[in-house]
Design a protein with these regions (language model features):
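N-terminal periplasmic "start-of-domain" segments of outer-membrane beta-barrel proteins
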Residues: 26-55, 82
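N-terminal periplasmic accessory domains that precede
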Residues: 60-63, 81-84, 96, 110-116, ...
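Short acidic/polar hinge/loop motifs at secondary-structure boundaries
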Residues: 100-128, 459
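Transmembrane beta-barrel wall of Gram-negative outer-membrane proteins
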Residues: 167-192, 204-259, 282-294, 344-352, ...
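Conserved C-terminal beta-signal and adjacent last beta-strands/turns
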Residues: 187, 240-244, 438-442, 468, ...
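Flexible loop and strand-edge segments within Gram-negative outer membrane beta-barrel domains
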Residues: 197, 226-232, 245-299, 307-334
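Membrane-embedded beta-barrel scaffold of Gram-negative outer-membrane proteins
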Residues: 294-314, 432, 438-440, 467-525, ...
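Gram-negative outer-membrane beta-barrel transporters
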Residues: 398-404, 494-499, 518-607
Length: 637
């Protein structure tokens, strides 16, 4: 369960060899200018530095929950958190970090609770067809995360400690050094908590008995979250070198060590001392980059490596004080990454790009608790290698200042199978400079191959699965108005529609386990709304408001599998039809009052959309309120 209250007390010490920084109020200014050629027709949400850094203890799952229209499925802090666009599933969301894809090749998804916002300097969401500009497989969209040079001058040290309720501690450290050519940064985050908060358990009822042991009343018990502790360590090393002659070199290395208990169910009547339910992970990600930049062209290359080791252990007391291993799942992933790209401008009207990337995965998954067969092979598990190749070329044309068009051609290979050509066409135009009213539209094909677990997981994997494929259409209107140092107002409204064939879904079998199959043709459509308002009320008082709303039906339009199949024409399970967020920020001098609210409509747990007590999840609301005051300490010179 999500923690209901988290109070953060931060002590920040900053040491610098340079002159003292000053905290200044930044007033919003609407800047009107030509749209970047790279972004012709692209529908994206860029998260600014305020959203990324306003609460240093946030993971990227928390940031996206309150600052975007996408669906974030989370079970609370330090628990699995996934994101999905436009009524699709988390495996339809492609995620990259400094250009390298970080989707788990076994599951196809990314755990955003494992990404501290403290480690991210730039984040953007590419909605729907716009993801084809970056990669294939993003039937819903893509999330781009990256770091950038610290822009330090000399040595710098930043240390922040967060102390929260339920013995929660967060430690943040950053060391920086910079000059005209070098930028070096080391960041570290350590978070820990027993996470044993109290809550009213409405999934249980305790009986009240009279002296004759007759039930005379019932009540909901107040319990503590059991078996929910966590210890997470993250270290990020960055080195950047700029020759000053158009060449830039970069190194990014990120290490994760996580040890998390998995909380007991709210309907579990056992004691937390009777079992141990734990997930551990060690991950290393490294990216080397080179950029060669000239006035009208650029070439770049990247190479990277990812290693992930994950363990899941489940132990129970047999009743005699001896803990028995029920499950000992182990998996390891090694991924080699390479990418080359180029850009060429012809005047200010044409931009041509080409990109080729490769990810080679080596995956081993097994359960060490399974009795070994002859030859030492486990009954449950697999060992597979799969290459993933993606290449694209594009031409972007801006015949006039107001009009832009873009054509992208992409093709991908997974294993030995190639996708059909993936075309995407984008167009945008300024309808009126008064109000900066712009329109965008796009259309694209897209494909996604099954994950390794979809194909080979034992028991249940289906090696005969087909790839998912379909066409998507987008259209949007946006505006931006404002008066310098007074106010700014911007907003957008977009419509989208996707037709996906051979949708993959895991379903129960008569053999007692789940198995994936291509059973559904899905029609996903809807609208997304977004608005931002910033007002300088006085020289010292400032108000900021942000709101989003999404309506995202995802309907099964396939044929019934059996006469009893009631899923046709129904919303897909676990996909909310509506979601919304509101953020309000009121600042005065060094004080900031912040209110955040998010909402997800009810979700069905059955493909038939059964409305019984167990057939749906109730609507979800969450509010966060915080009051902050920054207290600068005199720098040590």
């Amino acid at each position: 369960m999500r923690r209901l209250c988290y109070i953060l007390i931060a002590l920040c010490l900053t040491f610098s060899a340079m002159a003292e920084e000053r905290t200044v109020a930044i007033r919003e200014i609407t800047v009107l200018g030509q749209r970047p050629m790279k972004e012709i027709g692209v529908q994206q949400t860029k998260l600014d530095s305020v959203a990324l850094k306003e609460n240093i203890s946030f993971s990227m799952a928390d940031v996206l929950t309150f600052n975007s229209s996408i669906f974030v499925k989370s079970y609370g802090r330090a628990t699995l958190s996934t994101v999905a666009f436009r009524g699709t599933s988390p495996s339809h969301t492609q995620v990259s970090w400094n250009g390298m894809k970080i989707n788990n090749p076994m599951l196809g998804m990314t755990d955003f609770s494992m990404i501290p916002s403290y480690f991210i300097d730039d984040a953007s969401l590419l909605h729907g067809t716009s993801s084809v500009n970056e990669t294939g497989g993003g039937l819903g969209g893509a999330v781009k995360l990256s770091t950038k040079p610290a822009d330090a001058d000399g040595f710098g040290v930043q240390y922040i400690q967060g102390i929260g309720s339920f013995k929660s501690f967060d430690e943040f450290l950053r060391l920086t050094y910079g000059n005209d050519h070098w930028q070096i940064s080391t960041r570290a985050v350590y978070s820990s908590s027993p996470n044993d908060y109290k809550f009213l358990n409405r999934d249980k009822k305790e009986n009240v008995y009279d002296e004759n042991m007759n039930i005379i009343d019932q009540y909901y018990p107040v319990e503590r979250n059991r078996s929910g502790s966590y210890k997470d360590l993250h270290i990020l090393q960055e080195v950047y070198y700029n020759t000053g002659k158009g060449d830039r070199l970069g190194l990014n290395a990120w290490y994760i060590n996580s040890n998390r208990e998995l909380a007991m169910l709210t309907v579990d009547h056992g004691s937390d001392t009777d079992f141990d339910n734990r997930q551990r992970e060690q991950t290393f990600r490294g990216v080397l980059s080179w950029d060669h930049i000239r006035r009208n062209w650029k070439v770049a290359a990247k190479g990277g490596y990812t290693y992930t080791w994950m363990a899941y252990d489940y132990k129970r007391d047999l009743g005699n004080g001896v803990m028995a291993h029920m499950t000992r799942s182990r998996s390891s992933i090694n991924t080699i990454y390479g990418q080359a790209e180029g850009e060429y401008y012809i005047g200010n009207k044409w931009l041509f790009t080409a990109n080729l990337s490769m990810h080679q995965h080596f995956v081993e998954s097994r359960d060490k608790n399974i009795v070994l067969q002859q030859g030492g092979n486990g009954i449950l598990g697999y060992r597979k290698a799969r290459p993933e190749l993606s290449g694209s070329v594009s031409a972007k044309w801006r015949p006039t200042e107001r009009l832009g068009m873009s054509l992208v051609i992409r093709e991908e290979m997974f294993g030995r199978e190639w996708t059909p050509i993936i075309p995407a066409f984008f167009i945008d135009g300024v309808l009126s400079k008064r109000g900066n009213i712009a329109a965008k539209a796009s259309v694209s094909r897209n494909c996604r191959f099954p994950t390794l677990n979809d194909l080979y997981f034992l028991p249940g994997g289906n090696p005969d699965l087909k790839k998912e494929s379909g066409w998507s259409y987008d259209a949007a209107l946006s505006f931006a108005v404002g008066k310098q140092n007074v106010y700014s107002l911007s907003g957008s409204a977009s419509w989208f529609e996707s037709f996906i064939k051979d949708w993959i879904i895991w379903l129960p079998t008569t053999k007692g386990f789940f198995s994936p199959d291509n059973i559904k043709d899905v029609h996903a459509y809807g609208v997304e709304l977004q608005v931002d308002l910033n007002v300088a009320l006085t020289k010292e008082w400032q108000l900021g408001l942000n709101g989003t709303f999404s309506w995202t039906p995802s309907i099964n339009v396939g044929e019934p599998r059996t006469p009893a199949d009631k899923s046709v024409g129904k919303q897909l399970p676990y996909v909310p039809e509506r979601s919304s967020t509101i953020t309000g920020r009121l600042s005065w001098r060094r004080w900031v009052f912040l209110y955040k609210w998010c909402y997800y409509s009810e979700r069905y747990t059955m493909s038939s959309n059964d409305i019984s007590l167990s057939g749906k999840l109730p609507p979800y609301f969450m509010s966060n309120i915080s009051l902050e005051k920054s207290i600068p300490l005199k720098h040590i010179e």
